[in-house]
């Protein structure tokens, strides 16, 4: 069980409405709010809370079922609850599926229209809004880290375009907003790259992993702390937030995952049983949705505005592997 230790400095009356609490990030944001004594209310599309039943605070906190694509329902729910802040974690995140012709309208309805619905409701009650976005709003070319206030948008795929549309909906509707771009997300409550690698590593003796896509992982437990730090302030704007520890490839990440797993006693991932080979994106084969090569996000604005950076991704991975069963 995680131990939450915070120096409480917030408004005990702050009410925060969190979307997407069945997912990795929404789950952790709710727990962080509880740890700081804030009033957190979660929502997702399921009739009841359907995230990890792990006994943490989120499983017992108030929950409202809401379809964010239903404009009237969003307005009614948010104006009745009157939260001080809405942290919008809900999104369509299946990047390849988003390319299917029969899915595109739904993806846009969730990521763009749903976000507009929430922004409009926030404007009505003068609430702050946090919108979680992605490096996929850029074209992923070059090697220079993307700056949070860069406007050279050029999404490579449907998912990226709809997340950009969501960003613009927030920025064009509100003044009190935090748009936070993240990359390579992992958390306890949901599917992610680490869990996938641990699973395939058990059943294969050789894996090939892409080595020419570069970025940095983001642990939702660490990110949730930063997001709650943010809503305690009025330092609005665009931010980039991943863990520290440098820029790496998916191949580098995989090697470290298995190295740390072995250190924890999982010898099935040792190099004498499991070989991991680097390949280029071209060699790996075409995925339905194009992926950015350059997912480097510059995070210096966080420190400039007085926010505490996230721990290193290596440290985050170490803590994460001790949280999950594999």
Predicted features, each with a name:
Residues 16-34:
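N-terminal Rossmann NAD(P)H-binding glycine-rich loop of SDR-like oxidoreductase domains
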Residues 57-70:
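Rossmann-fold cofactor-recognition segment
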Residues 68-110:
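NAD(P)H-binding glycine-rich loop region in Rossmannoid oxidoreductase-like domains
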Residues 105-114, 137-180, 184-185:
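Catalytic helix-loop patch of NAD(P)-dependent Rossmann-fold dehydrogenases
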Residues 168-229:
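NAD(P)-dependent short-chain dehydrogenase/reductase
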Residues 188, 213-222, 242-260, 319:
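Substrate-binding strand-loop-helix patch
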Residues 233-287:
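Mid/C-terminal beta-alpha module of Rossmann-like enzyme folds, strongest
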Residues 303, 311-326:
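Amphipathic terminal alpha-helices
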